[in-house]
Each structure stands twice: as structure tokens, then as C-alpha cells.
Amino acid sequence: MAIDLTALWDFNKPDVSEQRFREALATASGDDALILQTQIARTFGLRKDFANAQKILQSLDAAVVTAGAEARARHALEWGRTFSSATHPAETQTAQNKQQARDAYERALTIARGGKLDGLAIDAIHMLAFVDTAPADQLKWAQQALAVVEASSQPAAKMWEASIRNNIGHALHQLGRFDEALEQFERAVVLRERGQNPRATRIAHWMVAWTLRAMGRTDEALAIQLRLEREWDAEDAPDPYVYEELEALYGSKGDEARANHYAQLRRSADEGAAT
């Protein structure tokens, strides 16, 4: 792929990303054009318009058959994401839809492995955790993805490490294995702090504090969440998840006044996000 897809993506603004991909598509050809269209389809999926995403991908079916490994793997990945992903409501996750997603992700994984596209192989493995949602299964898939990260020398694979360690930590947390979860989250923080994504770095710190609270290390968790509150507020982007944790932390300390204060802030932030 001659075009840097990462530079075109803003996952928080799929409409903006779509426009960027369409502008790039105007001068693209061959596999690059196919790949850009798979990403346009993904922008619709992020907006929960799965029907339009599928329509775009189906229009590529014939051309993808003779395309290279990257285009075929991305096409399969995005087809799977129209059936099972982080944006799908729970009621859509029928056995049939999950099987459609599994088939597509496994096909993407096979293609990516055959094409030595480690980053796409990791993407496919990590998407299988949206099909198999039991914490033990999610841990299994995340550990398999991490094995690919650690064995690969490809930048596209290495860039996944923080996300995959976060996923491992989340599964371990759900399993009540808090010490192990904390280790993974702290390693993810180190990786995030090397990058240039303040939002992802704050989320990584939030995961650490969330786990510290579960371990009874309330004061440490509180210090982190209060710092995160200040950082988000400085950007005029209040985070309801930080407020939720502060509500729980002050509640556990018996400070009902502060707990109620953060409960109100959380409700206000949630209402603001919904409008």
C-alpha cells in the first residue's frame, strides 16, 4: 500500500476519515483503490451503518478475487466487522452473525499470514475476541496476538503492542487476576508514553487506576484519576469514565459529598455526549 492509512484515520471522527479516504481514492488505482474503499466501508461501520458498509464491500467482491494479499485481507476484515465489532449492539450478536464474523476474521488471518502481513494478522486475531466474549477466550486471543507482536520485526505489528497489552489486562481484570492485569496495564502505559497520542495515554493510565481501585489501593487510584480529570478538563473534554471512578473512589472512602458531586458530573457528561 503506497498510501499511509494511519495518517488518514481519525477513529473519533469517521466522517472526516471518510472524506480523507475519498480524496485519496480520486488519484488511486489498483489494489490501493480497493484498500481505500475497504476503509471507507469501515467508517460506515463505526457510525453503525452496517448496511452501507456491506454494500461497499460487496461491490468489491469481484475485483478482490484477483487482488494482492493486503487488499484481500482488509476486505475480509471489514466484512467481518460488519457482523461483530465494538460498535455492535448486544442484540445484534446472534449465533449466525457471530459465525459470519468468525469466518471472515479467520479468512483474513489466513490471508495475512500467507502474505506475511503481521499487523493485519494481529488485527484479525484481536477481532476474534469480539466473537468469543468470555474473558478466558478474550485472554486466549489477546495472548495469541501478543505472540505475533513479539515475534515480528514489522512496524505495523509493533504498533499493536500497547493495545494488545491493554486487552490482556482487561481480560485478566475480568477474571479477577488483578496483579497480572496491573502489570500489563503498566507496560501499556510505558508504550503509550513513547508515542504521541495523549488520549490513548490517558486511557492507559485510567486502566491502571481502575485496577488499583479493584486491588484496594484507593489513594493511588484517586491520585491518578484526579490528575486525569485535570488533564481532560484542560482540553474541555470531560471524561465520564473518570467521573465514574472518582464517584466510586470517594464512595469507598465514605465521602458522600464528593461522591455525589462526581455522580452529577458524570450524568452531565453523559447527557452532553448523547446530544
Q: Which residue stretches match the model-derived regions?
A:
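Primarily a tetratricopeptide repeat
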Residues: 19, 55, 96-99, 103, ...
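Residue register of alpha-helical TPR repeats
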Residues: 35, 74, 123, 159-163, ...
